[in-house]
Amino acid sequence: ADGEAVAADAVVVTPDLPVAYERLLDLPPPAVLRRKPRYSPSCVVWHVGVPGEPEPDAAHHIIHFGADWQGAFDDLLRRGVLMRDPSRFVCRPSVHDASAAPAGSQALYVLEPTPNLADGELDWGESARSAMRDRLFGFIERAGYSSAVLTERLVTPQDWADQGMAAGTPFALAHTFGQTGPFRPQNVRKDAPGLVFAGSGTTPGVGIPMVLISGKLAAQRVDEVLR
């Protein structure tokens, strides 16, 4: 940030790849980014602390499916609006990690898929944030979770964008045919020896296992440079 130049044999770039090209790199982006890229849907995540410890038989991961599967995905992928009948994912980390919340309470988060900022016309200002919070509060009440909220944090697509994620999605470039496998941005460039990429925007793709693999591949590339 202060203009200091640091010499290096290899540099691993891990920010979201399109944002790295836009803000950090004085290099032309790969072809898939020069065309109009397709981004994965985004999501809202509501982190909540509530009183009471998890039940002995409580599940760590729970998916609550909506009834109108096709309509929900039409809303998400074609219309670019909030799903009228969404499926939601609930994670209760306190089930297996007592340190996730103080004694006598528990942590959970609720994830609802939403359009990304490129495909949707949603404004995630204070009014929309408040409406989404109320929507998710109503969901946890209906689903039987404790609704006596002690602490909370709502993360929206705009928050993801503010954190440096292209199109406001934490799930990077969509796994379409033209953005998968050999067509996904590669983790090295022939015109920039020693520059290596890792993360969900490069190969092999999205998801914790694949991102971890991308780190392993990046380490191998760095090893090749340093030999």
Language-model region placement:
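Mid-domain catalytic core of redox enzymes
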Residues: A1-P102
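Short glycine/proline-enriched loop/turn "hinge" motifs that connect secondary-structure elements
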Residues: A98-S105, Q186-K190
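Short glycine-/acidic-enriched loop or helix-start segments at secondary-structure transitions
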Residues: E22-L24, P182, G207-I208
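Hydrophobic, well-ordered secondary-structure elements that form the walls
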Residues: V12, V48, V110, I140, ...
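Flavin-binding catalytic cores
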Residues: E53-P54, V81-M83, D123-A161
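Conserved FAD/dinucleotide-binding core of flavoprotein oxidoreductases
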Residues: P18-R23, G49-P51, P102-G138
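A glycine-rich dinucleotide-binding beta-alpha-beta segment and adjacent secondary-structure elements
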Residues: D85-F89, G144-P204
